[in-house]
Amino acid sequence: MVLPSSLNFPRWLRDNQHRLQPPVCNCVFQEGEDFQIMVVGGPNSRTDFHINPTEEWFYQVKGRMLLRMADPQTHEITDEYIEEGGMLLLPALTPHSPNRFADTVGLVIERKRGGQKEAMRWYCEQCGRVVHERWFVCESLDRDLVPIINEYKASEELRTCGHCGHLNPTAYSA
């Protein structure tokens, strides 16, 4: 067995800033058998809500972020700002939309899901109903997540609420 050695996070961040690009701005920093640690930069302006079958731990290294959370039963959305130095443990299956501002950095630790399905969900900004939802197995953020986000952004049909007819935007504005 090869024992791990420490990494210099500020140096890693400086050398890998180019990897934190929109729309997700996310890069796996370290991964083990059970957990993965992701570095997430900004800005992004996601309108999707991610539904993860496992808990996620957020730590804000630099700046602040907005974590939009939807109640799994009522779909009521709550906005929680995580300030620099702040942390939050998000319960499993809580729809959430991590919105990050320019020149910010955060860490997210989550359990590896090993074939479990997760979802991307969009809510209508007018009436709060679910506009679109896509369940999938995520093996790679770039390969699996980005195409789902881009498909939604490119389709007025997917962004139009079937209940109230509102055409939802492709970017969140606070």
Label each region the model flagged.
Residues M1-Y59, R64-M87, P95-A174:
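Jelly-roll (double-stranded beta-helix
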